[in-house]
Regions:
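HIT superfamily nucleotide-processing domains
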Residues: 1-117
């Protein structure tokens, strides 16, 4: 697992830490769910790792499983589990990753299109 330098970690941490813990809609031992500040769908949630991990490439399998379970629970909580939703993990520059702190996008509430990119 690769953690970021202290300077970069502080910069990244501020992106997700500006929201108070009371704004977390769900939580597990190692991750939490927030509503996205810049939604790309009627429902756009972020499942964020509590530990600052740069990309999915550096994440332990157990954490990824826990985060996907939390994404599934978030979809149920927001009633998009039956109509359908999309899960996205942007990884590195060409994958569209803008914040280098592991997070999963959960998007729903409308018909998704393909191809997505």
């Amino acid at each position: 697992m690769l953690l970021l330098s202290d300077a970069y970690a502080s910069e990244v941490e501020s992106v997700f830490s500006k929201k108070p813990k009371s704004s977390w809609v769900l939580e597990s031992e190692n991750a939490y769910v927030l509503e996205d500040k810049y939604p790309q769908a009627p429902i756009h949630l972020l499942v964020v790792s509590k530990e600052i991990i740069q990309t999915v490439n550096h994440a332990p399998s157990a954490l990824l499983g826990e985060m996907l379970e939390l994404a599934k629970k978030a979809a149920q909580k927001y009633n998009i589990d039956k109509s359908g939703f999309r899960i996205v993990i942007n990884t590195n520059k060409e994958g569209g990753q803008g914040v280098y702190h592991l997070h999963i996008h959960v998007l729903g509430g409308r018909q998704m299109q393909w191809p997505p990119g």
